[in-house]
Amino acid sequence: MQNWVLLLFYFFWAFLMNAQNQLPLANASLEEIEPGTNNFVYWSNLQTNGGQVNYSIETENLIPGSSRAQKSEIISLGSNGWHVKTQSDYLFQVQSGQQYTVRFWAKVEGDNQATMKVVFQSEVQGSYQGNNKTINENWQQFSHTFTVSDDSDLNRLSFWYMDSGVTYYLDQVEVVVGKTISLNEAITYQEVDGFGAGIKRRTEHLYDLEVSLRNQIETLAFQDLEVNMIRFFIYHDLEDPNDNNNPFTLNQSALDWTRYDSNPNNWRTRYIGEALNNAFSLSINGFDHIIGNCNSAPAWMKTNGSHTNGGTLIPGFEDEYSEFLIGFLTGMSSRYNIDVTAISPTNEPDFEVSYESMNTTPEELSSILINLNNRLDDEGFSQVKVISPECFRVDSDNPSKSTTNYVNTMFEDPNVLQAVDIVATHPYQSSVTQDQWSNLKDASLEKPIWVTEAGNLGSPYTNMADASYHIERIIDGFNHGGLTAYMFHLFYEQHDYDNEISSSALVLWDSNNNILLPKRYYVFKHFANLVKGGYQRIHSSGFNNDLKIIAFKSHDDSKVIVNLFSEGSLSNVNIEIPEGAISVEHFVTSDQDENFSLITTDIFDLDNNYMSLNLGAMSMHSFVFSIDSSLSSNNDFLLDSNKVILFPNPAKSQLELSFRLSLERELIIYDVNGLEVLKKTYPKSNKIILNTEFLSSCCYSFSWRWWSK
């Protein structure tokens, strides 16, 4: 039985006219090859004037979603840069004053880096533009934006190889017009663990408030924010003094749980058990990660005899410290019915402060971690994750400071590498560059990476400029640092107007008991409420360094989330619409009245490839696309019609149609009067090459149909 679909799709061409070829580039993905050759369709490789290159097609160690890449082994260079190059043979139209962004993936072998020049040039004299890119040993996407000075119908993109003795790899090329954001769901990265914050401080202040006000604050923090992570103190005085002299026999009755209990008559009470259980009962989706963090071991275990002012663990007290942490886990479960899922034995060991702290070196911390990991297994807590080191900084030139430097040192020991389940950091340095995030990712050796505490400490502001502190760390951290989770320092705290110092918490109240919601609260909703645990980051490409972009898809492929933050105002921004999108929701937070507001006035045509919008300065935008998988994956026939490339148009002697799918097709051509001038069936292929010399100079339309058994 044959099923067939008939689709009318009209193109017009007028012969003996200059070509006006439109983007996108033909075979930009470098997937289609010429039959019987080792060359990509619409691409050519040159070696002239002494240049010598071994050109081939690579099929291994590619980026996700790719099956082929251009491989160029450079033996020697020519006398000029253009003598050794790969160029697109698809000549396309450009317009004066328009911006065109070139994106491509590349890597090199044979050296740790090499230079590749990206070139834009047409037949117009003086049209040459080139930009050098430093390519390293790992696949990476590069981009450059060209502004064209002259109109042309014959613009060409080429890649010049500028170093010999290395092998270049090139793949997934793209040229986009204007301000375009592209998505690639086939390229996936890390899986999200979640979003949250801490209650390490201020719980006693919250529980001093009237019950109705406290309930409002907790509802805002734990219900309206759809977080799934919470972090709290392991207090140093839980075991002070020593329970006994045997670190392997815990005396639970000697532990002091005052800080975790709810006793308003005791100044040391912190209501931790009640605060945690209230959070759990309010949560819509539940908490996947419940994290105990210890600033300092009990004073009697430390070199300075105090839980404050740094110091470190006395050598040989690792067993006692592990017993202390096991006692905490056991008591939280038995007393408060709370099963802690992750534990961290240090907080900012690289930061010297006067409050609760412990300045352990990487070597000292390594001993603690190995001992703790073994003890967790021995005591039946192997399911509890070990988090470390939670340094104050992501990266630093000082080798004794930062999470990156700690991890680089600690992971030299395979026992520490095995002991640590999650690499955790705080990003309190003034700024974190993309390279510093990448350094942390490399050092972490593919372990999950969490920001477990972050806040714009000391900022008196609650506007979008303050919120941008977190936006930049979240987007850059996930995009470049491999982050899988991000947590604020505190869920709630009182705002100190008198001293002009704001809290860095998510939910605030002032001295008059008025609740304040800073812009960072609404910005965090763009992530915590829209991007869930188990979602995957997907590849996204932008056009402007002032525009932060990140994208995710749900585990069942039913949603695609795109988050954007614009520092300056941008007009006519084009966002690629994912295949199979059947609806889109648009949320905005800005310095205006938009607070995670759902925009209902947008009119987007989801049948188009892109949707256009304007972005105001200092505004956060999130787009939630609902995907019908039957349209994006099963209905390939519909996609086939939307992915056709016609080249050249107008045509003189030959016309080529490239399709997404290889199918048997029947092509019918009509003249301007609607009379049939050609009807022909073509064998299964993703390309039709039509000799047009038999046609008179005129405009024509055509239709085609395909079928499958």
Locations of regions flagged by a protein language model:
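Aromatic/acidic polysaccharide-binding cleft in carbohydrate-active enzymes
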Residues: 448-525, 538-543
